[in-house]
Amino acid sequence: MARRILLTIEYDGTAYSGWQRQYNGLAVQQLIEEALTRATGEAITITGASRTDAGVHALGQCAHFDTSSRIPPEKYPFVLNTMLPRDIRVQAGHEVPDGFHARFMTCGKRYTYRILNSRHGSAIRRNTFAHIPVPLDVDAMRQALPTLLGTHDFAAYQASGGTAKTTIRTIRMTEMTVQGDEIILLVEGDAFLYNMVRIIAGTLIEIGLHRRSADAFTEAFRTLDRLSLGVTAPPHGLELTKVYYPEEAFRMPEAVRWHEE
């Protein structure tokens, strides 16, 4: 009998064309599917919670797949990590109900954007931080953040190519911390448009450089015009940190759950 398994996956996106399997480039999804096929002897297709772009990283990507293999769910990290490159790690495996869907059942996501605000950059952090060599006005950046909170039409915060049916989104939390020369932005919401977090980060950088006023986000909500906001920040500063699901999504039928009790 087929079971549905949910994996939690961490990856450094530097070497990859993104999460989603593509014809031109090596994707994270492809490598995990190939490892699963070897492990189970089945042709496996996985569905991810977020289709991260080339160069974007993940600490908490989630993906589900169906299998008739009797490999215990908690053993998948051990099995798959022996086959995967070191920049992709499976951190957890769980059995979920047949109706669970990693992408369509999400109720929120948290993203982290990292900025290195130093003159000369960093050899060690070059792939995980966006480097800004000019001093940023962090106070001005923080002043702009609360405007994003709540439910708004984020049409101006979507890059061309976005296919969302609605641009109404709810941002539940924003936070900016400074640790030495590192500026860390956290954004959490119910869902995000294409390149939305990178556009927010790019606008904050321009606010920090005094190229845009701190009310740029307010203006964008008024005009719904992409030109009201800053450039899209580089992909390598972005990380998908956590994916949230409603508690009921994990409730297993008694016949399946009994062996866990």
Predicted regions and their residues:
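Structured-RNA-binding interfaces characteristic of tRNA pseudouridine synthases
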Residues: 1-261
